[in-house]
Amino acid sequence: MSRKNRAPKREVLPDPLYNSKLVTRLINRIMLDGKRGTAASIVYGAFEQIKEATGNDALEVFEQAMENIMPVLEVRARRVGGSNYQVPVEVRPERRTTLGLRWLVTASRTRGEHTMKDRLAKEILDASNNTGASVKKREDTHRMAEANRAFAHFRW
């Protein structure tokens, strides 16, 4: 049964170490089975590795990586006259960060490094340098939107 109203969005609290809501969302994304402590130690450990590797503030490197991962355009299926078209649409800001975090964590999990801490750190470093699987995912999404530009007039 459908809702009468939209479910309210829960406000995410900024994390205690970096005072950033984006870091909290990353921790939530990495968390499995409600083990927030484990997820937090993975994220903070990865940030320590980033700081050692670059000498820069880990939060700045992470934000740069997110900027390089977050998509601007995506395609959505739209049914017109019996056939489905992939229509390119702009991505809302909230969805941009959600997709960026999802792609970052997915790409980290598929990497070959030994621990999740290492994988996450390397993926963030790669993404900040505009390389890596998560950036490739964004490029593929943009390429798909560009290829279907002819159907942009079906936008709703």
Curated annotation (Swiss-Prot):
InterPro entries noted in UniProt: Ribosomal_uS7, Ribosomal_uS7_bac/org-type, Ribosomal_uS7_CS, Ribosomal_uS7_dom, Ribosomal_uS7_dom_sf
GO CC term, one of those recorded: small ribosomal subunit
Biological process per Gene Ontology, one example term: translation
Molecular function as annotated in GO: rRNA binding; structural constituent of ribosome; tRNA binding
Keyword annotations: Ribonucleoprotein, Ribosomal protein, RNA-binding, rRNA-binding, tRNA-binding
RNA-binding as UniProt keyword: yes
Short name of any one Pfam family annotated for the protein: Ribosomal_S7
The keyword Ribonucleoprotein is annotated on this UniProt entry: yes
Top-level taxon: Bacteria
Function: One of the primary rRNA binding proteins, it binds directly to 16S rRNA where it nucleates assembly of the head domain of the 30S subunit. Is located at the subunit interface close to the decoding center, probably blocks exit of the E-site tRNA.
HAMAP family: Ribosomal_uS7_B
Family of the protein in this entry: Belongs to the universal ribosomal protein uS7 family.
Subunit structure: Part of the 30S ribosomal subunit. Contacts proteins S9 and S11.
NCBIfam families linked: rpsG_bact
Record protein name field: Small ribosomal subunit protein uS7
